[in-house]
Amino acid sequence: MKYKRILLKLSGEALQGSSKSTNIDKAVMEQYCEEIKTLVDEGVQIAIVIGGGNIFRGGQAESLGIDRVQGDYMGMLATVINAMALQSSLERHGMYTRLMAGIKMEQVCEPFIRRRAIRHLEKGRIVIFGAGIGNPYFTTDSTASLRAVEVQASVVLKGTRVDGVYTKDPEKFPDAVRYSKLSFQEAYEKNLNIMDMTAFTLCMENNLPIIVFDMNKKGNLLKVVNGEEAGTLIS
């Protein structure tokens, strides 16, 4: 395996599946667990950050008359709901997990302690990070970048519904062209919006590569971790 310790970033919306008839689609969850299990069987150390957009996004707060900070905390709680669902599903598939949160929730998860998180990874446990970094005004992309740097992951894998980074939105423009590789500088200059600027800068300053790939295509996660081209590498 090219990457021995990874940080996998998943979006909350992806858990809804294509029908979006429920907050969490069982078939999607099952597929994700099967993909992750293939890495565990290969000895890859896995940390996961999952969004909460299928339940609540902090950005919705203003339209609902909710204070921005309060809305961000609501979004953090949404990520914990998704993290708990993923944890249960992974354990049902025979994997060992630990859920760590950026805010205190002693009854359901551990607080984030960097050295403890690294030790969990070394012992082969999947570590799921919930509740963002515990502060408002930060996205789950920023959480992914920060936690990846903190636990010394060798790559951030951003699982999306498209197979990489394109010159423009491939869902709107059929003539969009996919990049196989980009430097951080190129991605910045082209304003490709791979992550928010805080998250992107953290990766760039720490020379932490990002791979954007289609998480919904079977076998893609294993290919990416193996170093095969199955998305866009930003480094």
What residue ranges belong to the model's regions?
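C-terminal catalytic "cap/lid" subdomain
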Residues: 1-235
